[in-house]
Swiss-Prot record:
Purpose of the protein: Catalyzes oxygen-dependent 5-hydroxyuridine (ho5U) modification at position 34 in tRNAs.
Keyword Oxidoreductase: yes
Pfam families on file: Rhodanese (PF00581), Rhodanese_C (PF12368), UPF0176_N (PF17773)
One example of a Gene Ontology biological process annotation: tRNA modification
Species name: Staphylococcus carnosus (strain TM300)
Protein name: tRNA uridine(34) hydroxylase
One example GO MF annotation: oxidoreductase activity, acting on paired donors, with incorporation or reduction of molecular oxygen
Length: 317
């Protein structure tokens, strides 16, 4: 595998995000890289793919900048590019929590736990482990015993915490996310909310899965990633499938977007059921005039009607 995927972030002052983003995009394109990078006055958050040579060049370029000299890159081997295009965009935040009073992780954040320390926390009955990711990420894979917030966007997490504050307030809290960036702010938010004992998995799931001591133990399922790979393995010791097929509840790790472009809900679906239900999450979406699955596969009106009949056998109507 000659390609690699880089995942990284750094909370650091960038005075002119717009100019930085434009110049950075040019550099990335010149070096054949593809991916998504967000830049703001609070720092940089990126994931990109390229050949080993091109990603080495990128790492060297970043570390030559005093602001990013100690940045940590999480590196995965890949068969090819994990993205179709290269985007570098200026944003208000590099991870959107949308708080009235923003959190600066350089000033307020939870205690950092190494992978081995985090594993101890997972096995501690007195510790509450909260997944800081979205529900569809959790449903594909998570740490054993972790709490699943009922959210589809990171910015909804503070409200969920406030609604459940009494359940967690006097507990030891440990949180985790994909690469660590969300927990930097989320753990800081918890401290601002009055939680006293707050810690986070340093480097996130991506680091835990590659740790030679923990080897990804106590992780079930796969880790959702925001690129064309969709998911990657974490647990090097044992393989478990915890995802459940949207229609029949059987074990499944295959995510698709609902074929209704106005819905786009992410659902776990087998190839057989994707065809059986026209790539949709419900009958209403299957009937949509701009159903992408119908258009892509040139489904006839007669075949479409047969597929719509299948919804009579399911609760997803």
């Amino acid at each position: 595998m000659d390609y690699r995927v880089l995942l990284y972030y750094k909370y650091v002052t960038i005075d002119d995000p717009e100019t930085f983003a434009a110049e950075h995009l040019e550099f990335c394109k010149e070096n054949n890289l593809k991916g998504r990078i967000l830049v703001s006055t609070e720092g940089i958050n990126g994931t990109l793919s390229g050949t080993k040579e091109d990603t080495d060049q990128y790492i060297a370029h970043m570390r030559a900048d005093e602001r990013f000299k100690d940045i940590t890159f999480k590196i995965d081997e890949a068969e090819g590019h994990a993205f179709k295009k290269m985007h570098v965009r200026p944003r208000h935040e590099i991870v959107a929590l949308d708080l009235e009073n923003d959190i600066d992780p350089r000033e307020t954040t939870g205690k950092y736990l190494s992978p081995s320390e985090f594993r101890e926390a997972l096995e501690d009955d007195d510790t509450i482990v909260i997944d800081a990711r979205n529900d569809y990420e959790f449903d594909l894979g998570h740490f054993r015993g972790a709490v699943r917030p009922n959210i589809t966007r990171f910015r909804d997490l503070p409200d969920w915490i406030k609604e459940n504050k009494e359940v967690f307030m006097d507990k030891k809290i440990v949180t985790y996310c994909t690469g660590g960036i969300r927990c930097e702010k989320f753990s800081g938010f918890l401290l601002k909310e009055g939680f006293e004992d707050v810690a986070q998995l340093e480097g996130g799931i991506a680091t835990y899965g590659k740790d030679p001591e923990t080897k990804g133990e106590l992780w079930d399922g796969k880790m959702y990633v925001f690129d064309e790979r969709i998911s990657v393995d974490v647990n090097q010791v044992e393989k478990t499938v915890i995802g459940k097929e949207w229609f029949d509840g059987t074990p499944c790790e295959r995510y698709i977007n609902c074929s209704n472009p106005e819905c786009n809900k992410q659902i776990l679906v087998s190839e057989e059921n994707e065809h059986r239900y026209l790539g949709a999450c419900c009958k209403e979406c299957a009937e949509h005039e701009r159903n992408r699955y119908v258009a892509k596969h040139n489904i006839s009106d007669e075949e479409k009607e047969k597929c719509l009949e299948n919804f009579k056998e399911t609760v997803q109507q």
